[in-house]
C-alpha cells in the first residue's frame, strides 16, 4: 500500500511517532516503538543484528526507519525512556486480508488464481502474532533505554512454500498459483 500511496504512512509512522514522543517527553513514561525488519531492506542470504545498517526499499520501511531515528533523538536529547523492537513477518487472527497467508486462503476458497511475486523464493521469517506480543511485553519490561531488539521466530520459509502448504491443507490444486511480476520495493 505504501508504494501506491505513501502519505498515510508518513503521517502515521513519522508524525504519529512525533506526537507520541512529545507526550513521553513531558510524562516521562516508558515508550516502545514497534518497528519492522524491513528497515534493513533486502538481506538476500544474510541476517541482520540490531546494529545492521538501514537500507529501506519501500516508502513504508523508510517511514519506519525515520521514526526510529526520531525515537533515538528523543532518548539522547530529552532523556526519554524509549526502546525499539523490529519484528519479522507476523501472521495470525485478524491479519490484513491483502497479506500473503489470508489472501492465499481467501482466494483458494474461491478457487481463484493466487498471485505469487517473482519466482516465489522470497524468504520470510514467520512470527505468530501472540509470540510477537509476548516478545514486545518482555522488551517493555526488561529492555534497556535506547536499545533496539530484533524479534524473530527462526521460522524462515519462502513464499511459494507457504502458498503450497496452504493449498495442500485446503486440498486445492497448485495450478491456482499464478506467478506475477515482482512489485517495486519488494525486499
Q: Where are the model-predicted features located?
A:
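Residue-level signal for the nucleotide or nucleotide-sugar donor/cofactor binding architecture
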Residues: 4, 12-15, 51, 58, ...
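Conserved helix-to-beta-strand junction in the class I
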Residues: 23, 27, 107, 142
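Active-site proximal helix/loop that lines the substrate pocket
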Residues: 1, 36-39, 89-95, 121, ...
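Short, glycine/charged-enriched secondary-structure capping and boundary segments
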Residues: 3-8, 45-49, 97-105, 130-131, ...
Amino acid at each position: 500500500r505504501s508504494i501506491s500511496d505513501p502519505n498515510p504512512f508518513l503521517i502515521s509512522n513519522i508524525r504519529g511517532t512525533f506526537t507520541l514522543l512529545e507526550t513521553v517527553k513531558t510524562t516521562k513514561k516508558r515508550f516502545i516503538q514497534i518497528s519492522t525488519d524491513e528497515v534493513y531492506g533486502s538481506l538476500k542470504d544474510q541476517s541482520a543484528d540490531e546494529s545492521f545498517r538501514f537500507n529501506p526499499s519501500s516508502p513504508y520501511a523508510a517511514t519506519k526507519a525515520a521514526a526510529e531515528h526520531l525515537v533515538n533523538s528523543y532518548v539522547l536529547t530529552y532523556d526519554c525512556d524509549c526502546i525499539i523492537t523490529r519484528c519479522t513477518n507476523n501472521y495470525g487472527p485478524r491479519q490484513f486480508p491483502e497479506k500473503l497467508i489470508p489472501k492465499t486462503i481467501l482466494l483458494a476458497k474461491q478457487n481463484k488464481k493466487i498471485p505469487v511475486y517473482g519466482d516465489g523464493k522470497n524468504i520470510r521469517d514467520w512470527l505468530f502474532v501472540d509470540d510477537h506480543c509476548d516478545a514486545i511485553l518482555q522488551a517493555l519490561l526488561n529492555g534497556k533505554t535506547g536499545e533496539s531488539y530484533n524479534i524473530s521466530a527462526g521460522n524462515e520459509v519462502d513464499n511459494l512454500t507457504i502458498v503450497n502448504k496452504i493449498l495442500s491443507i485446503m486440498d486445492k490444486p497448485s495450478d491456482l498459483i499464478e506467478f506475477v511480476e515482482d512489485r517495486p520495493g519488494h525486499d
